Amino acid sequence: MKPSLTEQLCTRCGLCCDGSLFADVELAGSAEAAGLEVMGLEIEEDDTEGGVLEQPCGALRGKRCGIYAHRPECCRTFECRLLQDARRGTVSVEQAVEHIAETLKHVGRVRKLAEELGQREVNLPLKERYADALALADEAGVSRSRARKRAELETEMSAVERSITEKFLRDSE
């Protein structure tokens, strides 16, 4: 039996859960939030009824959801642009896998450079880690090496944002 597109793509990716695409996931209501809390996930209160599940998701295991059968409604219904394009046949599975690998390479590089610049808080969304790393680089003073890493970080983050916008986010997001 041929694996589904989600098995072929989503389980190689994880960008929608690891803080690269989104900073948080809005929950459908208090019952959904309570169910996730019972499973050990931390829910942040906000101005919505259910609150939000901050990213990176605490249920993410590698690139797979550790609570897949019980994941939030927002997660169950989300399909990135790349998955939609693969379903329509406008992108082959092989091309989609290449896009995922390329984006993950840039995300990994952003994380590594952020850490090298002093940002070691791994449980933050990627954009927050990036912003923190830039601030830390500026606070520490400008050495040639730091300036080079800062510029490289900006270039890599630019590549991530371009890829996310063009390949993963739908027009309405």
Q: What residue ranges belong to the model's regions?
A:
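Hydrophobic scaffolds flanking metal-cofactor catalytic centers in soluble metalloenzymes
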Residues: 1-173
